[in-house]
């Protein structure tokens, strides 16, 4: 089974769960019209990188998709 959570990309509000620091997961940045899909093992760091990118500032929401069954091959 997997879980999907939502965060506020513009305000960098993602939560403080440990899986955000060191867990393989998929994520979707979106604004209702466009989406960017990515994967990372260190999603908090990756979100900081995206937030610094002018191209990614069009997004306002982030969805994290994770599972205890995900591994490095995600």
Per-segment meaning from a language model:
Residues 1-49, 72-73:
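GIY-YIG nuclease catalytic motif and its immediate N-terminal context
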Residues 43-73:
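A broadly used, surface-exposed interaction patch
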């Amino acid at each position: 089974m997997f879980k999907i959570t939502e965060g506020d990309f513009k305000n960098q509000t993602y939560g403080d769960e440990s899986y955000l620091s060191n867990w393989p997961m998929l994520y979707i940045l979106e604004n209702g019209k466009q989406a960017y899909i990515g994967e990372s093992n260190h999603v908090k760091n990756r979100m900081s990188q995206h937030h610094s990118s002018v191209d990614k500032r069009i997004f306002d929401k982030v969805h994290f998709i994770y599972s205890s069954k995900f591994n490095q091959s995600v």
